[in-house]
């Protein structure tokens, strides 16, 4: 008989406090494994020691290939994706998803595939929308899904974007109580329609996951998963493919980077700002160079050349000022 016994949790901005609160409410005999991704990038993380101190369960950074156990908390280490592979945990230095490594979606996606109805996915506070696609995968494969109430979250974006795929939306205290109720319980048996949906979702998620970890050709996988889009990857400048079969607009490139529309738009916003800053710097340097040339021609008595350079400098100054105003208004 299937029992819910694997909890995958994702958090970002404000996540340390939310995770400590959640860990403090777990019972010491929790009959489930807890796997956590917090967006820490490549930076050193003290999260396992903080969670161990906050509650009764031991927390540690996950190790590649280790067998996971119930009643333990495993945290993704810096700069490594954490995924589930059968009875073991794997650490992968794969392509970033939603500009993050570790990212939440790879953990949730692998949890959906490996655990099916045994899985419980939890999205906590954070910016943008990492975790939404992964929570959709867990729900599609028969798992239970929980989201922190946006009103209770330090950052509302991730909970809001994941809410369409949530079975329960609760503050952290309510999430902990609901998790205790769900763990060890038997998921309801799916009907025929649900079973067919689960099978279709499982095939799509399997294709996506195997391409991401390099078990099959990403080019062939992308042809199965979706269609070419008009966008290019912000990380590698490769072509992005729109992933079909999801209620979210999602994109992947053949090197493994993946984005939801929120993350993609945010990345493009950064690109626009960098481009505008580069253009403003170039215009300011052009102004300085032309003023220097104007002074040189003035000393040579060439007033026509001096006037020409000063006019070019004036136009460059105006253009740089316009860009600066646009940047300040953003």
Region locations from a protein language model:
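Short, charged, amphipathic alpha-helical segments
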Residues: 300-314
């Amino acid at each position: 008989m299937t029992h819910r016994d694997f909890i995958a949790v994702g958090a970002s901005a404000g996540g340390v406090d939310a995770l400590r609160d959640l860990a403090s409410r777990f019972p010491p005999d929790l009959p489930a494994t807890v796997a956590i991704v917090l967006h820490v990038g490549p930076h050193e993380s003290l999260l396992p020691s903080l969670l161990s101190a906050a509650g009764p369960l031991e927390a540690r950074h996950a190790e590649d290939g280790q067998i996971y156990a119930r009643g333990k908390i495993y945290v993704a280490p810096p700069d490594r994706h954490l995924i589930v592979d059968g009875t073991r945990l794997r650490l992968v230095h794969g392509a970033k998803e939603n500009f993050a490594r570790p990212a939440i979606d790879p953990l949730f996606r692998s949890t959906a595939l490996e655990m099916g109805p045994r899985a419980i996915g939890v999205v906590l506070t954070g910016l943008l929308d990492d975790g939404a696609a992964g929570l959709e995968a867990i729900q599609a494969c028969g798992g239970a899904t929980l989201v922190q109430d946006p009103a209770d979250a330090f950052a509302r974006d991730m909970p809001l974007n994941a809410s369409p795929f949530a079975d329960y939306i609760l503050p952290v205290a309510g999430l902990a109580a609901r998790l205790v109720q769900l763990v060890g319980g038997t998921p309801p048996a799916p009907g025929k329609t649900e079973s067919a949906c689960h099978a279709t979702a499982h095939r799509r998620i399997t294709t996506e996951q195997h391409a991401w970890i390099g078990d099959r050709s990403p080019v062939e996988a992308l042809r199965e998963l979706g269609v070419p889009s008009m966008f290019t990857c912000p990380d590698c400048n490769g072509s992005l493919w729109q992933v079909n079969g999801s209620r979210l607009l999602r994109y992947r490139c053949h090197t493994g980077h993946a984005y939801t529309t929120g993350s993609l738009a945010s990345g493009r916003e950064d690109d626009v700002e960098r481009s505008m800053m580069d253009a403003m710097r170039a215009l300011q340097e052009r102004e300085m160079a032309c003023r220097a040339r104007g002074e040189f021609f003035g000393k040579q008595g060439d007033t026509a050349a001096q006037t020409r350079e000063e006019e070019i400098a004036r136009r460059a100054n105006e253009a740089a000022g316009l860009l600066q105003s646009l940047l300040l208004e953003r």
